[in-house]
Amino acid sequence: DVYKRQVWENMSFNPYERKLRTCACWGVTWLTVIFWAIPVALVSLFSNVDYMSDKIGFLGWIKKIPSVPLGIIKGVLPTTALAILNSLLPPWLRFHARMSGVPTRNLIELSLMTRFFIFMIVQNFIILTVLAGIQQNLEAFWDDVKEPKKFVQDISSAIPRASSFYLSYMALIGLSASAGIFSQIIPLLLYYVKIRFLGSTPRKLWHLRNDFNSPAWGTLYPSTLFMTVIAFGYMVLQPVTNGFACVAFFLLYLAYRYSYLYVFDCKPIKETAGQFFVKAIHFLSLIHI
Protein backbone atom coordinates (compact mmCIF):
# COMPACT_ATOMS: atom_id res chain seq x y z
CA ASP A 1 0.00 0.00 0.00
CA VAL A 2 2.86 2.39 0.75
CA TYR A 3 4.32 1.58 -2.65
CA LYS A 4 1.02 2.32 -4.39
CA ARG A 5 0.54 5.55 -2.44
CA GLN A 6 3.71 7.15 -3.76
CA VAL A 7 3.88 8.94 -7.11
CA TRP A 8 7.37 7.79 -7.89
CA GLU A 9 8.01 10.05 -10.88
CA ASN A 10 7.49 13.06 -8.56
CA MET A 11 9.99 11.88 -5.95
CA SER A 12 13.07 13.01 -7.89
CA PHE A 13 12.19 16.74 -7.96
CA ASN A 14 14.33 19.05 -5.84
CA PRO A 15 12.53 21.65 -3.67
CA TYR A 16 13.12 24.52 -6.11
CA GLU A 17 11.81 22.57 -9.08
CA ARG A 18 8.76 21.47 -7.08
CA LYS A 19 7.99 25.09 -6.09
CA LEU A 20 8.38 26.25 -9.69
CA ARG A 21 6.10 23.50 -10.96
CA THR A 22 3.57 24.29 -8.22
CA CYS A 23 3.43 27.97 -9.21
CA ALA A 24 3.12 27.10 -12.90
CA CYS A 25 0.34 24.57 -12.31
CA TRP A 26 -1.58 26.97 -10.08
CA GLY A 27 -1.28 29.56 -12.84
CA VAL A 28 -2.79 27.10 -15.31
CA THR A 29 -5.53 26.32 -12.79
CA TRP A 30 -6.47 29.99 -12.46
CA LEU A 31 -6.43 30.41 -16.25
CA THR A 32 -8.81 27.46 -16.45
CA VAL A 33 -11.08 29.05 -13.85
CA ILE A 34 -11.09 32.35 -15.78
CA PHE A 35 -11.67 30.96 -19.27
CA TRP A 36 -14.27 28.47 -18.03
CA ALA A 37 -16.52 31.52 -17.69
CA ILE A 38 -17.31 31.22 -21.41
CA PRO A 39 -19.24 27.91 -21.21
CA VAL A 40 -20.71 28.95 -17.84
CA ALA A 41 -22.02 32.15 -19.46
CA LEU A 42 -23.66 30.08 -22.18
CA VAL A 43 -25.31 27.95 -19.50
CA SER A 44 -26.64 31.05 -17.74
CA LEU A 45 -28.31 32.17 -20.99
CA PHE A 46 -30.72 29.23 -20.80
CA SER A 47 -31.99 30.36 -17.40
CA ASN A 48 -32.96 33.77 -18.87
CA VAL A 49 -34.46 32.73 -22.18
CA ASP A 50 -37.48 35.02 -21.70
CA TYR A 51 -35.33 38.12 -21.48
CA MET A 52 -32.99 37.01 -24.26
CA SER A 53 -35.89 36.26 -26.61
CA ASP A 54 -37.20 39.81 -26.04
CA LYS A 55 -33.86 41.52 -26.61
CA ILE A 56 -32.41 39.35 -29.41
CA GLY A 57 -34.54 39.28 -32.52
CA PHE A 58 -33.66 35.88 -33.98
CA LEU A 59 -34.53 34.20 -30.65
CA GLY A 60 -38.16 35.26 -30.87
CA TRP A 61 -39.17 31.73 -31.87
CA ILE A 62 -38.55 30.67 -28.27
CA LYS A 63 -41.81 32.38 -27.24
CA LYS A 64 -43.73 29.96 -29.46
CA ILE A 65 -42.50 26.91 -27.55
CA PRO A 66 -45.20 25.29 -25.35
CA SER A 67 -45.00 25.96 -21.64
CA VAL A 68 -43.87 22.46 -20.61
CA PRO A 69 -40.84 22.22 -22.97
CA LEU A 70 -40.01 25.85 -22.20
CA GLY A 71 -40.05 25.10 -18.48
CA ILE A 72 -37.64 22.21 -19.07
CA ILE A 73 -35.33 24.49 -21.07
CA LYS A 74 -35.32 27.14 -18.33
CA GLY A 75 -35.23 24.84 -15.30
CA VAL A 76 -33.70 21.47 -16.11
CA LEU A 77 -31.39 22.19 -19.06
CA PRO A 78 -29.17 24.84 -17.37
CA THR A 79 -28.63 22.81 -14.20
CA THR A 80 -27.96 19.63 -16.18
CA ALA A 81 -25.48 21.44 -18.42
CA LEU A 82 -23.74 22.90 -15.36
CA ALA A 83 -23.47 19.45 -13.75
CA ILE A 84 -21.96 18.05 -16.96
CA LEU A 85 -19.44 20.91 -17.15
CA ASN A 86 -18.46 20.31 -13.53
CA SER A 87 -17.90 16.60 -14.19
CA LEU A 88 -15.45 17.37 -17.02
CA LEU A 89 -13.07 19.43 -14.90
CA PRO A 90 -11.80 17.17 -12.04
CA PRO A 91 -9.52 14.98 -14.25
CA TRP A 92 -7.91 18.14 -15.64
CA LEU A 93 -7.41 19.66 -12.17
CA ARG A 94 -6.10 16.34 -10.84
CA PHE A 95 -3.54 16.42 -13.65
CA HIS A 96 -2.47 19.90 -12.46
CA ALA A 97 -1.93 18.57 -8.94
CA ARG A 98 0.07 15.62 -10.23
CA MET A 99 2.26 17.75 -12.50
CA SER A 100 2.99 20.19 -9.66
CA GLY A 101 5.14 17.52 -8.05
CA VAL A 102 2.86 16.28 -5.25
CA PRO A 103 4.57 13.09 -3.99
CA THR A 104 1.59 10.98 -2.84
CA ARG A 105 -1.86 10.16 -4.20
CA ASN A 106 -3.72 11.26 -1.08
CA LEU A 107 -2.05 14.68 -1.25
CA ILE A 108 -3.07 14.89 -4.91
CA GLU A 109 -6.70 14.43 -3.83
CA LEU A 110 -6.28 17.14 -1.19
CA SER A 111 -4.87 19.49 -3.81
CA LEU A 112 -7.74 18.59 -6.14
CA MET A 113 -10.22 19.46 -3.38
CA THR A 114 -8.75 22.96 -3.03
CA ARG A 115 -8.63 23.60 -6.78
CA PHE A 116 -12.11 22.26 -7.45
CA PHE A 117 -13.67 24.19 -4.56
CA ILE A 118 -12.10 27.45 -5.76
CA PHE A 119 -13.44 26.75 -9.24
CA MET A 120 -16.97 26.07 -8.01
CA ILE A 121 -17.11 29.18 -5.83
CA VAL A 122 -15.66 31.52 -8.46
CA GLN A 123 -17.46 30.11 -11.50
CA ASN A 124 -20.62 28.38 -10.33
CA PHE A 125 -21.51 30.85 -7.60
CA ILE A 126 -19.96 34.29 -8.11
CA ILE A 127 -19.74 34.55 -11.90
CA LEU A 128 -22.94 32.62 -12.58
CA THR A 129 -24.88 34.72 -10.07
CA VAL A 130 -23.58 37.97 -11.55
CA LEU A 131 -24.27 36.85 -15.12
CA ALA A 132 -27.80 35.76 -14.25
CA GLY A 133 -28.57 39.22 -12.90
CA ILE A 134 -26.69 41.23 -15.52
CA GLN A 135 -28.38 39.53 -18.46
CA GLN A 136 -31.76 40.79 -17.25
CA ASN A 137 -30.65 44.44 -17.37
CA LEU A 138 -27.67 44.81 -19.69
CA GLU A 139 -28.27 48.49 -20.45
CA ALA A 140 -28.17 49.57 -16.80
CA PHE A 141 -25.12 47.43 -16.17
CA TRP A 142 -23.06 49.00 -18.96
CA ASP A 143 -24.15 52.48 -17.86
CA ASP A 144 -23.04 51.82 -14.27
CA VAL A 145 -19.68 50.16 -15.03
CA LYS A 146 -17.90 53.51 -14.82
CA GLU A 147 -19.49 54.32 -11.45
CA PRO A 148 -18.18 51.93 -8.77
CA LYS A 149 -20.97 52.65 -6.28
CA LYS A 150 -23.78 51.87 -8.71
CA PHE A 151 -21.84 48.93 -10.10
CA VAL A 152 -21.61 47.33 -6.65
CA GLN A 153 -25.34 47.91 -6.18
CA ASP A 154 -26.04 46.18 -9.50
CA ILE A 155 -23.96 43.20 -8.44
CA SER A 156 -25.71 42.96 -5.06
CA SER A 157 -29.14 43.19 -6.69
CA ALA A 158 -28.19 40.39 -9.08
CA ILE A 159 -27.79 37.85 -6.28
CA PRO A 160 -31.52 37.30 -5.49
CA ARG A 161 -32.36 36.93 -9.20
CA ALA A 162 -30.28 33.76 -9.50
CA SER A 163 -32.10 31.97 -6.68
CA SER A 164 -34.44 30.02 -8.97
CA PHE A 165 -31.47 28.56 -10.83
CA TYR A 166 -29.84 27.35 -7.62
CA LEU A 167 -33.11 25.90 -6.37
CA SER A 168 -33.28 23.82 -9.55
CA TYR A 169 -29.63 22.88 -9.11
CA MET A 170 -30.13 21.63 -5.55
CA ALA A 171 -33.23 19.69 -6.57
CA LEU A 172 -31.33 18.09 -9.46
CA ILE A 173 -28.34 17.12 -7.33
CA GLY A 174 -30.46 15.89 -4.44
CA LEU A 175 -32.66 13.69 -6.63
CA SER A 176 -30.38 12.57 -9.46
CA ALA A 177 -27.17 12.17 -7.45
CA SER A 178 -28.81 10.16 -4.68
CA ALA A 179 -30.66 8.02 -7.24
CA GLY A 180 -27.42 7.39 -9.11
CA ILE A 181 -25.62 6.41 -5.91
CA PHE A 182 -28.36 3.98 -4.92
CA SER A 183 -28.73 2.42 -8.38
CA GLN A 184 -24.98 2.22 -9.22
CA ILE A 185 -25.84 1.79 -12.90
CA ILE A 186 -22.58 3.20 -14.30
CA PRO A 187 -20.33 1.19 -11.92
CA LEU A 188 -22.35 -1.93 -12.76
CA LEU A 189 -21.82 -1.44 -16.50
CA LEU A 190 -18.13 -0.70 -15.97
CA TYR A 191 -17.82 -3.86 -13.87
CA TYR A 192 -18.97 -6.10 -16.71
CA VAL A 193 -16.84 -4.21 -19.25
CA LYS A 194 -13.74 -4.66 -17.06
CA ILE A 195 -14.51 -8.34 -16.50
CA ARG A 196 -14.83 -8.84 -20.25
CA PHE A 197 -11.80 -6.89 -21.45
CA LEU A 198 -9.40 -6.49 -18.49
CA GLY A 199 -9.65 -9.86 -16.73
CA SER A 200 -6.74 -11.38 -18.65
CA THR A 201 -5.22 -13.25 -15.68
CA PRO A 202 -6.74 -15.01 -12.64
CA ARG A 203 -5.16 -12.40 -10.34
CA LYS A 204 -6.70 -9.47 -12.25
CA LEU A 205 -10.03 -11.25 -12.44
CA TRP A 206 -10.02 -11.82 -8.68
CA HIS A 207 -9.28 -8.14 -7.98
CA LEU A 208 -11.98 -6.98 -10.40
CA ARG A 209 -14.56 -9.18 -8.67
CA ASN A 210 -13.55 -8.56 -5.06
CA ASP A 211 -12.10 -5.05 -4.81
CA PHE A 212 -14.53 -2.27 -3.88
CA ASN A 213 -14.48 1.26 -5.24
CA SER A 214 -13.21 4.03 -3.00
CA PRO A 215 -14.93 7.41 -2.58
CA ALA A 216 -13.51 10.28 -4.63
CA TRP A 217 -12.93 12.67 -1.72
CA GLY A 218 -11.32 15.30 -3.94
CA THR A 219 -14.60 15.89 -5.82
CA LEU A 220 -17.13 14.79 -3.20
CA TYR A 221 -16.19 17.41 -0.62
CA PRO A 222 -16.21 20.43 -3.00
CA SER A 223 -19.60 19.43 -4.43
CA THR A 224 -21.11 19.12 -0.95
CA LEU A 225 -19.46 22.34 0.21
CA PHE A 226 -20.85 24.16 -2.81
CA MET A 227 -24.38 23.13 -1.90
CA THR A 228 -23.71 24.31 1.66
CA VAL A 229 -22.52 27.69 0.38
CA ILE A 230 -25.70 28.04 -1.70
CA ALA A 231 -27.84 27.18 1.33
CA PHE A 232 -26.03 29.70 3.55
CA GLY A 233 -26.03 32.39 0.86
CA TYR A 234 -29.76 32.22 0.13
CA MET A 235 -31.20 31.16 3.49
CA VAL A 236 -32.30 34.78 4.16
CA LEU A 237 -32.76 36.11 0.62
CA GLN A 238 -34.81 33.08 -0.44
CA PRO A 239 -35.96 31.10 2.63
CA VAL A 240 -37.45 28.30 0.51
CA THR A 241 -33.82 27.34 -0.19
CA ASN A 242 -33.67 25.91 3.34
CA GLY A 243 -36.32 23.33 2.49
CA PHE A 244 -34.63 22.32 -0.75
CA ALA A 245 -31.28 22.08 1.03
CA CYS A 246 -32.67 19.91 3.84
CA VAL A 247 -34.29 17.49 1.39
CA ALA A 248 -31.17 17.34 -0.81
CA PHE A 249 -28.80 16.75 2.11
CA PHE A 250 -31.11 14.15 3.66
CA LEU A 251 -31.28 12.18 0.40
CA LEU A 252 -27.51 12.41 -0.02
CA TYR A 253 -27.04 11.32 3.59
CA LEU A 254 -29.11 8.18 2.99
CA ALA A 255 -27.30 7.46 -0.27
CA TYR A 256 -23.78 7.90 1.09
CA ARG A 257 -24.58 6.08 4.32
CA TYR A 258 -25.63 3.07 2.26
CA SER A 259 -22.53 3.39 0.06
CA TYR A 260 -20.10 3.63 2.98
CA LEU A 261 -21.64 0.55 4.61
CA TYR A 262 -22.04 -1.71 1.57
CA VAL A 263 -20.33 -0.26 -1.52
CA PHE A 264 -17.22 1.82 -0.78
CA ASP A 265 -13.88 0.69 0.56
CA CYS A 266 -11.72 3.45 2.05
CA LYS A 267 -8.36 2.31 0.72
CA PRO A 268 -5.18 3.11 2.70
CA ILE A 269 -3.57 4.79 -0.32
CA LYS A 270 -6.14 7.62 -0.02
CA GLU A 271 -6.11 7.86 3.78
CA THR A 272 -5.42 11.39 5.06
CA ALA A 273 -6.31 11.02 8.77
CA GLY A 274 -9.23 13.45 8.50
CA GLN A 275 -7.48 16.23 6.58
CA PHE A 276 -10.36 16.51 4.11
CA PHE A 277 -12.80 17.32 6.91
CA VAL A 278 -10.43 19.85 8.49
CA LYS A 279 -9.95 21.61 5.16
CA ALA A 280 -13.71 21.61 4.56
CA ILE A 281 -14.33 23.31 7.93
CA HIS A 282 -11.67 25.91 7.12
CA PHE A 283 -13.28 26.63 3.75
CA LEU A 284 -16.73 27.02 5.28
CA SER A 285 -15.38 29.29 8.02
CA LEU A 286 -13.61 31.44 5.43
CA ILE A 287 -16.74 31.72 3.26
CA HIS A 288 -18.87 32.59 6.32
CA ILE A 289 -16.46 35.34 7.38
Where do the PLM segments sit?
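Transmembrane transport/permeation module of multi-pass membrane proteins
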Residues: 1-287
